[in-house]
Swiss-Prot record:
Similarity comment text for this entry: Belongs to the PPase family.
Cross-referenced InterPro entries: Pyrophosphatase (IPR008162), Pyrophosphatase_sf (IPR036649)
Record bears the keyword Magnesium: yes
Protein name: Inorganic pyrophosphatase
Gene3D superfamilies documented for this protein: Inorganic pyrophosphatase
Entry EC number(s): 3.6.1.1
Record key words, sorted: Cytoplasm, Hydrolase, Magnesium, Metal-binding
Residues where substrate binds: K30, R44, Y56, Y142
A Gene Ontology term for the protein's cellular component: cytosol
Sequence positions that bind Mg(2+) 1: D66, D71, D103
NCBIfam families (alphabetical): PRK01250.1 (NF002317)
Disulfide-linked positions: none
Protein's organism: Vibrio cholerae serotype O1 (strain ATCC 39315 / El Tor Inaba N16961)
Lineage: Bacteria, Pseudomonadati, Pseudomonadota, Gammaproteobacteria, Vibrionales
Catalyzed reactions per annotation: diphosphate + H2O = 2 phosphate + H(+)
Length: 176
């Protein structure tokens, strides 16, 4: 089955499906799912010896301002394999700017049908302070050793901003 058949979610923007590209705490390898074939490609070996603090993926059938689908970080008790799909609920967004322009990273927690562990997290401020600090630290530094690349973290925004990011990106993809 092609991942193109995976919808953006069950009920946008509150109930989304995230296609995982990079497992949490994995080796410093940037994987990307090829949208046409569904194959997981090695995009690059990261120069900085760092690992993603959460599972990292995207929402299918969306188009962010950077030209890619909406990026999503998914905290889970266990790393998820690349190419897997998890049902989630957005709780916040980390706004950033990089060498390509505006770049937002939505944070979404597993849907209650997958795990009740995250039911109390309704907004980014409900996330553990240490997790937010780890995410910020990672994105401030993960491109430091890559020539011509840079990142500026602009700050955290709430669940409403995350939902708006998903909706506008979904509409942009539908209208392209």
């Amino acid at each position: 089955m092609s991942l193109n058949n995976v919808p953006a979610g069950k009920s946008l923007p509150d109930d989304i499906y995230v296609v995982i590209e990079i497992p949490a705490n994995a080796d410093p390898i940037k994987y990307e799912v090829d949208k046409e074939s569904g194959a997981v490609f090695v995009d690059r070996f990261m120069s900085a010896p760092m690992f993603y603090p959460c599972n990292y993926g995207y929402v299918n059938h969306t188009l962010s301002l950077d030209g890619d689908p909406v990026d999503v970080l998914v905290p889970t008790p266990y790393p998820l394999i690349p190419g897997s799909v998890i049902r989630c609920r957005p709780v916040g967004v980390l706004k950033m700017t990089d060498e390509s322009g505006e770049d937002a990273k939505v944070v979404a927690v597993p849907h209650t049908k997958i795990s009740k562990e995250y039911d109390h997290i309704q907004d980014v401020n409900d996330l553990p302070a240490l997790l937010k600090a780890q995410i910020t630290h990672f994105f401030e530094r993960y491109k430091e050793l890559e020539s011509g690349k840079w990142v500026k973290v602009d700050g955290w925004e709430d669940a409403a901003s995350a939902r708006a990011e998903i909706l506008s990106s979904y509409e942009r993809a539908q209208n392209k």
